[in-house]
């Protein structure tokens, strides 16, 4: 069975995850997998901790897609690619970003961000689809 990329650590308001064509409400402890689309409503926010200790915090009205995530807990090797389709995302990088920042990227509808720091905020405007 596939291991989750991470878990929801904080959830406020209306937050859902779309996985394999099904949409479910999110609560603290909900696993997040590669391919999941996490959405926050206008009253929602969500904090996700990935298995390399990366912290992703999506603000109200956001849509976040986890495109790729791989992390080896023995060697700390891995990669992360996520897309912020709309809204805001605060990021504190974990072990992958600290040891191999070239392996961490975030996309928006208009740009691809390569990471060289450890904390940053991304905003994407648009319809999020």
Per-region residue spans from a language model:
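Flexible, surface-exposed loop/linker segments and immediately adjacent secondary-structure boundaries
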Residues: 1-38, 42-129
């Amino acid at each position: 069975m596939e291991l989750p990329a991470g878990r929801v650590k904080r959830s406020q308001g209306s937050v859902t995850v779309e996985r394999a064509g099904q949409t479910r409400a999110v609560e603290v402890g909900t696993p997040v997998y590669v391919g999941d689309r996490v959405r926050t409503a206008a009253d929602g926010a969500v904090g996700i901790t990935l298995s390399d200790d990366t912290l992703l915090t999506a603000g109200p009205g956001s849509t976040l897609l986890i495109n790729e995530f791989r992390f080896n807990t023995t060697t700390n090797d891995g990669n992360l690619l996520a897309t912020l389709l709309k809204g805001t995302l605060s990021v504190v990088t974990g072990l992958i970003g600290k040891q191999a920042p070239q392996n961490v990227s975030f996309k928006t509808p208009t740009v691809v961000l390569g990471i060289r720091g450890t904390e940053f905020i991304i905003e994407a405007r648009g319809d999020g689809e």
